[in-house]
Amino acid sequence: MTTVAHAVGTALARLGVTTVFGVVGSGNFHVTNALTAAGARFVPARHEGAAAVMADAYARVSGGLGVLSVHQGPGLTNAMPGITEAATRRTPRLVLAAEATAPRSNFHIDQPALARAVGAVPERITSASAAAADLARAWRTAVTERRTVLLNLPLDVQAAPAPAPFDVPAPPAPLPPPEPDDAAIEALADALVAAGRPVFLAGRGARYADAELTHLSERTGALLATTAVSRGLFRGNPFNLDVSGGFATPAAAELIRSADLLVGWGCSLNMWTLRHGALVGHDTTVVQVDIDPDALGAHHRIDLGLVGDVATTARATARELDRRGCHSAGYRSVKIAERLAREGRWRDVPREEQPEAGRIDPRALSAALDDLLPAARTVAVDSGNFMGYPAMYLDVPDADGFVFTQAFQSIGLGLATAIGAAVARPDRLTVAALGDGGALMGISELETAVRLGLDLLAVVYDDEAYGAEVHHFGPDGHPVEHVTFPPADLAAIGRGFGCAGVTVREPGDRGQVAGWISGPRDRPLVVDAKVTRGQPSWWLAEAFRGH
């Protein structure tokens, strides 16, 4: 007898699922086994929360669907931070969760309500006869609408005989991306023609439109910038400002603030990207292009909003400019290019050292790592006071090389994010940049990294504190003993899991890291970097101004 659980798992593999993350319990045992029997790879994590984050990172880096398999009740609740991160970011994700529907079961919770509460879409396999249609609907929503879908699998339905044949309708062909009407394109072209200092700001929605935006920027003389999550999109372009917002270099911030036209492409223009509005000049015309009409003007005032796919809109605008015969140098000049070559990276910005005995400046650490690491790298960054250093000092080869965990601003997601990214791109060395607080929250997944044989470097910026809280409240005289901790030997903990482990306290210690990078890299390396603690990072100081 073929059960519904077996039929669902087999059908998912036939639909194209190749990789599944999760933790197996009795409720998701059979559907997971069916997936692997049909050819999918199952990546078992040590905790459901980590598995959820791995699936999110895998989807973001691979460009495919992330799939998570969890037990009913506590298996699902354990996974909620990662599910919330994905739902907030609108990562295409299918969560397979067993469901105890008996009200008196100790596993019973309102799982659909839980999904809705965090922005995910709840679906359910309602019966054996409807299972194929229910699965097709959940799949279609996840893939075509780029949503995180919780597909509940009631235990009794899973065990029921599946109808034969179990035919899941093929997903419909994707609809053509929306394009603004002619009047909107003409209005954007008018704004570009009138601008003398245009800046293009590309977000997550522009991830696959780099060629179109680069071409349009060359026609209009626009400088290029990205949100943090899209860092690397314009790497190598001499007019690339890198990241806007709190992470922006002084040169980038000045040039963005001086723009007379700011066009946001597939980005929300939120407080982080615009430094609470400080990067928008009083006379700057603001345009926003987004596929979601509700996103237009949601965070910042705009003068023109266009509902459309970024690549499609950029191509249409370029055609309109071609029709008009318009071409402008705009904001671009030899002087600007030379300035960006000198000042375009944070490591090129002069800094005062922060000496502290037995501790290394996180900026010096990050710059040294950038020099040591191979160019083919993926950088995954956890949340915390430290995060600007690896985010902006470690270069990345492209937008797929940077994975940021800030949609929900939960700490402790960095290591699992790196693992998911490493599974998606095993051809690149993956760097997990962590604070000590986040590292200790997710440290059990070091065993997963070892077991999978991942090419992974975990760098812990260890200030023995929740540094953001120390720097936020400490200067006002508040006690900070609840957010500071005694020293821990994180390198030794890493070795206990089977990793290599080194402690870095000064620049000379980087030789141990260099040896691992140039060696066979047959096991992950944990670097416990004891960083200086005297001042908040520059991005945190900017964030405090908005609180």
What are these regions (language model features)?
Residues 7-17, 57-63, 87, 141-145, ...:
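Glycine-rich phosphate/diphosphate-binding loops that line cofactor/substrate pockets in enzymes
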